Amino acid sequence: MKKKNRIAVIGGGVSGMTAAVTAAEQGADVLLLEQKEMTGKKILVTGNGRCNYTNRVQTPQCYRSDDPEFPWKVMQKFPAEKILELFQEMGIYPKDRNGYIYPNSDQASSVAETLQEELDK
């Protein structure tokens, strides 16, 4: 019998919740740690309450890192199109405003609720 991976994800924002959902879908036993009273709380204020969850224009200059190659490596492995695809699979459809991607509902709560539903599965 294959041993289940055990993973701890620190932070219950968009990235943490998405990482936890993805790991669980891959069969991992996931523990999501969040210091706030609920996961997804910070999502509700991102993008002025609309949740700008990714950007079409991603360049290494937009990110800070001691390793100048690190942002480029991450962007190559997980580009905006892959994020859009992942979110659409969960039922979050995009609205593009000059390269800034929001949920079609324009409500950050729809992103938080959908991610929480995915976590609860």
Model-derived regions: residue spans:
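Small-residue (primarily alanine) positions within well-ordered alpha-helices
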Residues: 15, 19-24
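Short beta->alpha connector loops at strand-helix junctions that form conserved
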Residues: 34, 55, 98
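Glycine-rich FAD pyrophosphate-binding loop
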Residues: 8, 24-48
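Beta1/beta-strand and adjacent pyrophosphate-binding region of the FAD-binding site
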Residues: 2-15, 31
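Short, contiguous strand/loop micro-motifs
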Residues: 6-7, 69-73, 102
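N-terminal glycine-rich dinucleotide-binding loop that anchors FAD/FMN and/or NAD(P) in oxidoreductases
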Residues: 44-77, 81
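Feature captures the FAD/FMN-dependent oxidoreductase FAD-binding
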Residues: 77-121
